[in-house]
């Protein structure tokens, strides 16, 4: 199915602006600290690791690392919802924190399902950070609105990305800089955002960084604020099952 052609996509391109939320796992320096004895050794190790990473284009060097990192690495082995394996990576976020958490919870379940054996404790504890950043482009698309909404089933397919990857390639070829689309994971019908290039950011620093604690088990994923006494936000496995099984990204 060619959604872009069916919806006369070139005629749907509009200026787009907004604020997105992204949730990321804290790894990096915490991981390297476990490999050395002193902070001085860690600093040296971080420098060595930096030289082994893909080089940054000049236009990205002024961006905060949370904004530039997603563009720096190749896609996963299955690509992404709107990106093929051979294409540059996109920056994905959500319009609301709850939607970002629902998306992140799915990938925590994918992580759990990929383990040969679950941990003895029956859970995985991890630290995450949420942040906000504004975007503004002249060439944007809203896939959650007509005429694209008639293809919602394909846009939100739980495991088959072939149609959306074809759409992503078509948008990229048409010069689209950013787009919004319906979330496939959010039970409240949230909206996600994707940026094709760093030029879509209207600021170079993230806003409103918030720390979160995450608990992953075989049955649920929970996020809780690491700063305030807050009720955990729970996402049950049943939200993501298709015919009784957890679909794998493909």
Locations of the language-model features?
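Active-site and NAD+-binding cores of ADP-ribose-processing enzymes
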Residues: 1-84, 109-250
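A short, exposed loop/beta-hairpin motif centered on an aromatic-Gly-Thr core
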Residues: 89-94
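Generic detector of short, well-ordered, non-transmembrane alpha-helical segments enriched
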Residues: 95-96, 175
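An acidic- and aromatic-residue-enriched active-site/binding cleft used to recognize and process polar
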Residues: 96-97, 184
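Contiguous mid-protein beta-loop-alpha structural module that forms a pocket-lining wall or clamp
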Residues: 99-105
């Amino acid at each position: 199915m060619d959604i872009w052609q069916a919806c006369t996509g070139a005629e749907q391109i509009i200026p787009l602006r907004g604020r997105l939320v992204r949730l990321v796992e804290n790894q990096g320096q915490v991981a390297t600290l476990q490999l050395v004895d002193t902070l001085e050794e860690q600093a040296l190790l971080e420098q060595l690791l930096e030289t082994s990473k893909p080089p940054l284009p000049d236009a990205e060097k002024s961006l905060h690392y949370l904004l530039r990192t997603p563009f720096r690495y190749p896609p996963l082995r299955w690509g992404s919802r709107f990106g093929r394996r051979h294409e540059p990576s996109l920056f994905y976020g959500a319009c609301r924190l709850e939607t970002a958490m629902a998306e992140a919870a799915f990938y925590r379940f994918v992580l759990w399902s990929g383990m040969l054996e679950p941990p003895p404790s029956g859970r995985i504890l991890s630290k995450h950070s949420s942040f906000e950043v504004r975007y503004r482009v002249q060439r944007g698309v809203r896939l959650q609105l007509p005429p694209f909404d008639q293809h919602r089933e394909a846009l939100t397919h739980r495991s088959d990305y072939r149609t959306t990857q074809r759409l992503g390639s078509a948008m990229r070829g048409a010069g689209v800089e950013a787009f919004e689309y319906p979330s496939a994971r959010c039970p409240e019908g949230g909206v996600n955002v994707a940026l094709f290039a760093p030029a879509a950011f209207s600021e170079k620093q993230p806003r409103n960084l918030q720390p979160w604690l995450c608990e992953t088990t075989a049955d649920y994923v929970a996020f809780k604020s690491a700063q305030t006494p807050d009720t955990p936000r729970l996402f049950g496995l049943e939200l993501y099952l298709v015919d009784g099984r957890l679909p794998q990204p493909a």
